Amino acid sequence: GRTVAERAASEGALVLIVDRSDARSEVVAAIRAAGGTADDISVDLETWEGCSLAMQKAVDLWGRIDVLVNNVGGTIWAKPYEHYEPHQIDAEVRRSLFPTLYCCRAAIEHMLPQGSGVIVNVSSIATRGLNRVPYAAAKGGVNAITASLAWEVAERGIRVVAAAPGGTEAPPRIVPRNPNAEEEQREDWYKTIVDQTIQSALMKRYGTLDEQAGPILFLASDDASYITGVTVPVGGGDLG
C-alpha cells in the first residue's frame, strides 16, 4: 500500500491514505516531503460507514475520485480448514472481501455522475492455495466483484480491474494481522504456504514491492484504458 501511494504521488496523483493505523500519517508526511500531495483519514473499511466516509473525504478535498485502489485484506490465520472456528471464517471474509465490496459501491456513487473513474482491486493468487480457504474464498469474491461490476459500468466510463499479487518480500507489518499468531497456528502450517507459493511460481521466488506496485499503477493509468473486468496475476507465472 505504501509503495503504491508513494509512487502514485510521485507521478502527480493526489493521494488519500485510508487506514486505522497511525502509520498513515507517516506516509502522508513522506509524500509531502517529496513534493507530493496527500492527506489521510482513519476509518474502519470493514464497515459501510467507514468506506462511505473515506470516499466523501476525497471528494471534499479534491472534488472528485478518479482512481480507487482497494488494498485492504490479508490472511489472519494460516491453517488447514478443519481447524478454523466459525468466528475466524467470518473475520477472514470480513477483512478481505467487505472493504472492497463496500468501497466499490461508495466510489461509484461519485464516479457515475462524473462519467469516469478507475477501480483497481487488489486480489491474490491465493484463490488457489493451501491453508487459507476462507481468505481464498474472500479473494475469489474480489475477482467476481471485478468482473461483474466492470460489466455493469463499462459503458458509463468506469473501468474495474484487479491485480492478483503472489508472494511478496515486504518488511514486517506495523500492525500485525494477527498478534496471537504464535499461539493460534503452527509454524509448519505457515511454512506450507511459503513452500507452496514458491513452488507454484515459475520464477521460484517472491516478488518485490515495486514489482507489485507497478502493475497496479499501470492498471490505474490511461495506458490500460482498454482493459477492464479482468484480474491480472502478478505471481511470477503462478496464475492462481
Residue locations for each model-derived region?
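Canonical Rossmann dinucleotide-binding motif of NAD(H)/NADP(H)-dependent dehydrogenases/reductases
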Residues: G1-L16
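The beta1-alpha1 cofactor-binding region of Rossmann-like NAD(H)/NADP(H)-dependent oxidoreductases
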Residues: S42-A54, P86, D210-E211
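Catalytic Tyr-X3-Lys loop
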Residues: D66, E82-Y102, S116, V120, ...
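Conserved mid-core segment of classical short-chain dehydrogenase/reductases
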Residues: T75-D90, P113, N131-P134, R173-N178, ...
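Short C-terminal tail/terminal secondary-structure segment
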Residues: A78, I216-L217, T228-G240
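Active-site helix of classical SDR
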Residues: C104, A138, T146
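Alpha-helical segment proximal to the catalytic Tyr-Lys
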Residues: E109, W151-E155, S225
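A glycine/serine/threonine-rich, flexible loop-to-helix segment
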Residues: E155, G167-S200
